[in-house]
Amino acid sequence: MTIQKFLAMKGKEKIVMVTAYDTPTAKIAEEAGVDIILIGDSIGNNVLGYDSTIPVTMEEIIIHLKAVRRGAPNSFIVADMPFLSYGHSIEEAVKNAGILIKNGANAVKIEGGKFHCNLIEKCINIGIPVMGHLGFTPQSINIFGGYKVQGKKEDSKKTILESAIALEQCGVFSIVLEMVTEELAKEITEKISIPTIGIGAGRYCDGQVLVFHDIVGLNPNFKPKFSKQYANTYSIMLNALKEFKKDVKEKNFPKERHTFKGGK
């Protein structure tokens, strides 16, 4: 998969993106044939036990990026730029983006609007593809005051639309639209020539992304409205561990077939 192929898919074939955080989930994603694997800073909420994405560090992204690349050697991988890996200085941000590329990413994702255009242009000029991210941007959760749908009011709608146009002009190859009204997502998708990938952004984006753990049901207490659970893996894993515990306690495991014998 290449950026040129993604661009050609706009308006013709829906783009499928999922998160993956380790080698096993990456292997599953690649075998399923998804178009893009995202090493999201959502690793903070879903794997590392943080309350938000804000504590996630470059070092943590890199460790999991390497694991995902080993599990999905043939996939197009986008890595999130975590909080404070950009925004302080363009030079530092470009260096961090380059580190992610060197460690296996095909592109990086940067949250925020036209404020970051100088950074995005700098990255692209030295060969680092960039995916944008507008609407609800999790790294700004303290400003938003929680998980809130964006683009309901005219001023918010205008800002997001203008930012989408600006991001296209400065060279991003696609834009994630998160938790924005369906009407706004449709308008943006129709007004820009690059693909939009929605998460809680309705039916009219050029593609969709969901968190792996939400898809397979590994987060029993977190079921956002915009997501869909396709399996209840949490229950399957829980029951397996309970069965293992029961077998050990009742001396039903291991059996003779699980043991090794001495001899020549």
Swiss-Prot record:
GO terms for biological process: pantothenate biosynthetic process. GO terms for cellular component: cytoplasm. It is an enzyme of class 2 (transferase). The active site is at E178. GO terms for molecular function: 3-methyl-2-oxobutanoate hydroxymethyltransferase activity; magnesium ion binding. Its cofactor is Mg(2+). It catalyses: 3-methyl-2-oxobutanoate + (6R)-5,10-methylene-5,6,7,8-tetrahydrofolate + H2O = 2-dehydropantoate + (6S)-5,6,7,8-tetrahydrofolate. Mg(2+) binds at D41, D80, E111. Its EC number is 2.1.2.11. It is found in: Cytoplasm. NCBIfam families: panB, PRK00311.1. HAMAP family: PanB (MF_00156). Homodecamer; pentamer of dimers. Belongs to the PanB family. This is 3-methyl-2-oxobutanoate hydroxymethyltransferase. It comes from Thermosipho melanesiensis (strain DSM 12029 / CIP 104789 / BI429).
